[in-house]
């Protein structure tokens, strides 16, 4: 995944508009749109500001140490964090029951 795709995906995951990002970084909307379209690259200073605004590290933004699969998982976790407490508890309960089910199946399959 290219940086332009990570910019757009992460921005959408945290429910920010391109205009909000441009404002937080202190650049024009046109400049920010060029980053997401791949027509322009941010300066190092702006890269730091973008990572902060996107609530991720520069390494994550640049795709370092993160597989696409891990990045997708992180985006999902960040979306879950935006849910209210009751919705988060419901997801936690479903996840816990799936993990128990998986463990039980694993024990039964290896014990047979």
From Swiss-Prot:
Signal peptide: none annotated. Keywords: DNA-binding, Repressor, Transcription, Transcription regulation. PROSITE patterns: HTH_CROC1. One of its GO terms (molecular function) is DNA binding. It comes from the Bacteria. InterPro entries: Cro/C1-type_HTH (IPR001387), Lambda_DNA-bd_dom_sf (IPR010982), RstR (IPR049639). Residues 18-37 bind DNA. Residues 7-61 form the HTH cro/C1-type domain. Transcriptional repressor of the integrated CTXPhi phage gene rstA2. This is Cryptic phage CTXphi transcriptional repressor RstR. The gene is rstR1.
């Amino acid at each position: 995944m290219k940086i332009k795709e990570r910019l757009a995906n992460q921005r959408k995951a945290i429910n920010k508009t391109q205009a909000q990002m441009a404002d937080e970084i202190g650049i024009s909307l046109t400049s920010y749109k060029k980053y997401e379209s791949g027509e322009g690259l941010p300066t190092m200073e702006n890269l730091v500001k973008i990572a902060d605004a996107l609530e991720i590290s520069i390494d994550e933004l640049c795709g370092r140490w993160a597989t696409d699969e891990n990045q997708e998982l992180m985006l999902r976790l960040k979306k879950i964090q935006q849910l209210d407490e009751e919705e988060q508890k419901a997801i936690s309960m479903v996840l816990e029951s799936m993990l128990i089910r998986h463990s039980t199946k694993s024990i039964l399959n290896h014990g047979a």
